[in-house]
């Protein structure tokens, strides 16, 4: 759940991602129609999508309709939370994995980026200042990740504008990239999907440089942050206390689900022995442990891999992560949540650099100075 005082009344409101079935009561009357392929065959969704999504075809192309629960926007009305997502214009039922509040247009009102996994579009909701939001992603973003996961915001070039990064699963070397490449040929390929999303969705990280014009430049390749394997959490912070925002990235997965060879073996088993054999096949596989990443911001929109140097390139299946000054010495420490193992707690031993600690206090009801930048 992501918190922000989006209506600027002095108390925290919250946006809750919900990405699982069964549907809520409001979806009980949803109807789906059969979509046929070019030879009259039904269009079959990938197995992971069949539980909670349908597909429709319009004159402008294909569109996915998700049938999971809606996300929730809770407005804090003096200690009582009221769900206002529909009236606020942020009513989505896609497979959300992260939500980030940030004032991207510097108008003083918190805006919201929702990163959605699988085929669901990402959304950049501009806060209109009247309790409602407008999705400006199609005109503000050149493209987004395909399988968006973790995300974070920071001013990576110290120009006073907040930039943003959303993660995906692009392989960090040639072998990983080819082994996880999707099938783009034949009737069961994903090639149809590349034609209809606006903005387009590509399977790699996205780094959005804020131009201050209402549009972003996507510069992941330029920064060196485009491909970090099966990425989950992204956490920006000045880890070396040099005045520039560095970034920690957690990686790994319970199984190597995107390995093309393994997927082909699974499909052959299912065809010959049934779906139970396919599930048993994956149960016998080891988790996909990958190294976590740490990148130092070198300035000029360049980042260098310093994970080994900083002792953060631990090979594990790491999902969530959080930065904070745990020991009160003025630098940022790190906590990482690991699948099937104990969490990692990393103390920052930085002895150089400058620190500044602020204790902000607001006026009136906003005692905690919510919304201060």
Regions found by a protein language model. Name each.
Residues 1-373:
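Acidic, glycine/proline-rich Ca2+-coordinating loop motifs
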């Amino acid at each position: 759940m992501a918190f922000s005082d989006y209506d600027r009344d002095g108390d925290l409101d919250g946006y809750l991602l919900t990405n699982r079935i069964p549907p809520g009561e409001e979806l009980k009357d949803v109807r789906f129609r059969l979509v046929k392929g070019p030879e009259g065959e039904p269009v079959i969704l990938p197995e992971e999508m069949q539980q909670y999504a349908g597909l429709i075809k319009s004159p402008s192309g294909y569109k996915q309709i998700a049938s999971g629960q809606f996300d929730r926007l809770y407005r804090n009305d003096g200690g009582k939370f009221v769900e206002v997502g529909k009236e606020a214009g942020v009513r989505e039922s896609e497979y959300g994995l992260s939500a980030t509040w940030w004032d991207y247009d510097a108008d003083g009102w918190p805006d919201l980026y929702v990163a959605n996994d699988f085929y669901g579009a990402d959304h950049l909701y501009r806060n209109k200042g009247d309790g409602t939001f407008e999705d400006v992603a199609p005109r503000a973003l050149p493209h987004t990740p395909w399988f968006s996961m973790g995300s974070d915001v920071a001013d990576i070039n110290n120009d006073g504008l907040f930039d943003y990064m959303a993660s995906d699963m692009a392989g960090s070397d040639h072998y990983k990239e080819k082994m996880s490449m999707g099938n783009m040929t034949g009737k069961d390929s994903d090639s149809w999907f590349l034609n209809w999303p606006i903005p387009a969705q590509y399977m790699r990280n996205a780094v959005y440089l804020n131009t201050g014009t209402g549009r972003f430049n996507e510069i992941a390749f330029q920064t060196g942050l485009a491909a970090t394997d099966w990425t989950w959490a992204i956490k920006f912070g000045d880890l070396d206390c040099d005045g520039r925002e560095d970034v920690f990235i957690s990686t790994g997965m319970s199984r190597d689900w995107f390995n093309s060879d393994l997927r082909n073996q699974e499909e052959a088993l299912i065809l010959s022995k049934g779906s139970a054999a396919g599930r048993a096949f994956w149960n016998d596989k080891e988790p996909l442990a990958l190294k976590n990443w740490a990148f130092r911001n070198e300035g000029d929109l360049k980042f260098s891999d310093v994970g080994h140097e900083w002792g953060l390139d631990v090979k594990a299946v790491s999902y969530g992560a959080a930065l904070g000054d745990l020991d009160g010495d003025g630098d940022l420490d790190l906590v990482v949540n690991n699948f099937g193992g104990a969490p990692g707690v990393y103390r920052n031993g930085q002895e150089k650099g400058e620190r500044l600690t602020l204790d902000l206090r607001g006026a009136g009801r906003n005692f905690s100075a919510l919304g201060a930048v």
